[in-house]
């Protein structure tokens, strides 16, 4: 059976999180803060919506791409991982080798929760296999997912035409 080929893209997006801020000498309160970033799209649909819960709720996790709170070096390593290339920081990927697609919007910590996939790269295709939520401190159990586990397949040339320029912009400037 032939796998459907999806088209990877990107779109600017913003997630709003309540963060604690100092509002006086001793007083703190939670205030909404916008976290702009570049979201993956699959066939024109934001990845967060592709993996939305049955209620329609979407996760607060984001990509670190074009995210002012993510260090450029981390953004570059994240994109290397998405391309299936070696990373400089081992904490960029899960300890089981899975690649994070979406990470915590406030600190990018893989132990908060991350949407991950087994990345398979062949001559012609890239596959995000068994997309699932996981934390790095526990083994992944696909049977315990709260929503169906899906896989996505992309044409490698089209995929790299989206991802590689993002990496080059970070490493060549």
Language-model regions, residue ranges each:
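Intrinsically disordered, low-complexity acidic regions enriched in Pro/Ser/Thr
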Residues: 1-173
């Amino acid at each position: 059976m032939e796998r459907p080929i999806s088209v990877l893209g990107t779109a600017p997006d913003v997630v709003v999180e309540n963060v604690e801020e100092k509002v006086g000498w001793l007083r703190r309160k939670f205030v909404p803060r916008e976290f702009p970033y570049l979201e993956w799209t699959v066939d024109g649909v934001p990845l967060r919506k592709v993996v939305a819960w049955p209620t329609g709720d979407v996760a607060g996790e984001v990509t670190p791409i074009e995210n002012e709170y993510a260090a450029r070096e981390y953004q570059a390593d994240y994109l290397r991982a998405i391309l299936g290339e070696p990373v400089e920081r081992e904490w960029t990927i899960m300890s089981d080798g899975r690649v994070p697609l979406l990470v915590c919007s406030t600190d990018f910590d893989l132990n908060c929760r991350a949407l991950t996939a087994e990345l398979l790269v062949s001559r012609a295709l890239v596959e995000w296999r068994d997309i699932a939520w996981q934390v790095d401190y526990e083994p992944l159990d696909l049977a315990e997912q709260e929503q169906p586990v899906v896989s996505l397949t992309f044409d490698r040339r089209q995929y790299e035409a989206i991802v590689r320029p993002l990496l080059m912009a970070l490493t060549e400037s």
